[in-house]
């Protein structure tokens, strides 16, 4: 069975092979732990919450920051990670530089508490 890559497996596999990885420093995301998403859905159902709730990770991180954090977690060579700008890539689809969410409603209504990215790595890859 072919497993789909995510940023963690992509960076980890490349660095383990000693391959260079190009990661953008100007695209920012909020990585989300799937268990946090599941807990938020359960919380919304239990509270019979109405409306739209944003669920994501706790803070904005560039792909470069995410890659460096992954390399540190697995004790891999960060010097193989190349810093690039979005404008240098030939991406088929335009990507927004920043995506993220205001979590205040989810935090106050659902008692949502996002797991920090480093903690997520420790849980998934002890």
Predicted regions and their residues:
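Conserved beta-strand termini and adjacent loop/short-helix elements that scaffold enzyme active sites
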Residues: 24-26, 83-86, 117
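Mid/C-terminal beta-alpha module of Rossmann-like enzyme folds, strongest
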Residues: 40, 47-92, 98
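Amphipathic terminal alpha-helices
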Residues: 116-126
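Glycine-rich Rossmann NAD(P)(H)-binding loop
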Residues: 23-28, 53-60, 109
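NAD(P)-dependent short-chain dehydrogenase/reductase
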Residues: 1-29, 36
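Residues in well-ordered alpha-helical elements
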Residues: 35, 42, 64, 104, ...
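Residue-level signal for the nucleotide or nucleotide-sugar donor/cofactor binding architecture
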Residues: 2, 29-32, 61, 101, ...
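A hydrophobic C-terminal alpha-helical subdomain
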Residues: 87-109, 114
């Amino acid at each position: 069975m072919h497993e789909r890559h995510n940023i963690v497996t992509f960076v980890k596999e490349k660095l383990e092979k000693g391959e260079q990885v190009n990661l953008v420093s100007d695209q920012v995301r909020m990585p989300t732990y799937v268990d946090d998403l599941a807990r938020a859905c359960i919380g919304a159902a239990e509270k019979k919450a109405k409306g739209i709730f944003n669920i994501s990770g706790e803070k904005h991180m560039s792909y470069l920051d995410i890659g460096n954090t992954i390399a540190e977690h697995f004790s891999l060579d960060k010097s193989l990670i190349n810093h690039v700008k979005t404008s240098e890539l030939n991406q088929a689809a335009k990507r927004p530089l920043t995506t993220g969410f205001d979590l205040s409603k989810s935090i106050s209504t659902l008692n949502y508490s996002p797991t920090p990215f480093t903690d997520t790595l420790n849980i998934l890859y002890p």
